[in-house]
Amino acid sequence: MTNEFLPVSRQDMAQRKIKQLDFVYVTGDAYVDHPSFAHAVISRVLEHHGYSVGIIAQPDWKDDKSITVLGEPRLGFLVSGGNMDSMVNHYSVSKKRRKSDAFSPGGVMGKRPDHATVVYCNLIRRTYKKIPVIIGGIEASLRRLAHYDYWSDSLKRSILLDSGADLLSYGMGERSIVEIAEALDSGLDIKDITFIDGTVYRTSHLEEVYDVTRLPSYESLTEDRLNYARSFYIQYCNTDPFSGKRLAEEYPNGIAVVQNPPQKPLTQDEMDIVYGLDYQRTWHPMYDSDGGVPAIEEVKFSLVSNRGCYGGCNFCALTFHQGRIIQTRSHESLLNEAKKFIEDKDFKGYIHDVGGPTANFRQRACKKQEKYGVCANRQCLFPKPCPNLIVDHSDYLKLLRELRSLPKVKKVF
């Protein structure tokens, strides 16, 4: 490990002999350098590929100077509302303001604005007019096309339009962000980066976009709720990276938002690399006086072993973010991570969680998915389990036993 947090000040940049950062990551969460926090993962992945990244965590959106603390980045700003949609973070289902924010120092509420992604982009644009702005994270990912907003009881446009960002990275963005960085670094204008899977862009020339499936227009969605249902169904049928089509949603004044097909899932080797990077596994020391960041407590001694879920539950948005194809880490990678944190002075012998969206999904649903992806019009588990479904928990049980056998480990959950 480097034993270094990512730069959060000019002093940090000077210590690393960085005159100008390649990227500045603006996030609605406090800076926690842990693989359960998206800003840490994306930033460390970029760092692994040779790019310098600084973090502006929870800037004061009422002060334009708060966005200039690290200077103008060479390639662009990365913006995320945080690990959770900022509105879900702020309000209960009854639309009452929550009293605490686990992703803020000391659990204090009010460190980020409502609709944080949009507000942060506007903050950047007031100071840096031409710098590329790329948005991502759960808030941007699930609002990438027209969507019903529960909080305002209205149909909102794509967050790409409302934020004024140049590009949106949806889903788990490790591969997309590296391709974006390489494109920008090669000298391509952000407006010309329209070819990367897992991204959404806007255009005034939809007729020039090839092989595109047109969704019902935004205007038609506001006129007929059945059009909204049709649009959602088309989107749902195109969440697979192997068969998903390019989608376009038209808006007034000749503007269209184009969603490229999803990125291919990471291989096990790639997953191992992502989770084996130089995370400090705790909050930045600048939060010590506040008592730290509460959100780390639930994941400090937990392990992310897999991604994706083929459950297909109606109430769950996971298909739209991580997809239905299971991606797993190797036993060696998980054991190495566990060996690191069991030496922590706060470790009491309990590994709190080993899993992901669904802990016992340690392999793809069937062999076909390796080459062809998921079935477009069939579910793995509904209305009854598919006969091709591989039901085998032996690998998961073996992993749990291996973790349990480590010194100082009492129980694994």
Language-model regions: role of each:
Residues Y25-G28, I56, D60-W61, K340-F413:
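Conserved SAM/AdoMet-binding glycine-rich loop
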Residues T2-Q20, A30, S231-S302:
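N-terminal [4Fe-4S]-dependent radical SAM core
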Residues V41-V53:
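Short helix-loop-beta junction
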Residues D166, V274, C309, L334:
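Conserved, mostly hydrophobic/aromatic
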Residues V26-Y31, D290-A317, Y350:
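N-terminal pre-triad scaffold of radical SAM enzymes
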Residues Q322-F347, E402:
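Conserved alpha-helical substructure of the radical SAM core
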Residues A30, A38, A57-P252, Q259-N260:
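Glycine-rich beta-alpha loop elements in corrinoid/cobalamin-binding modules
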Residues V32-H34, R44, K62-D63, D85-M87, ...:
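Flexible loop/turn segments at secondary-structure boundaries
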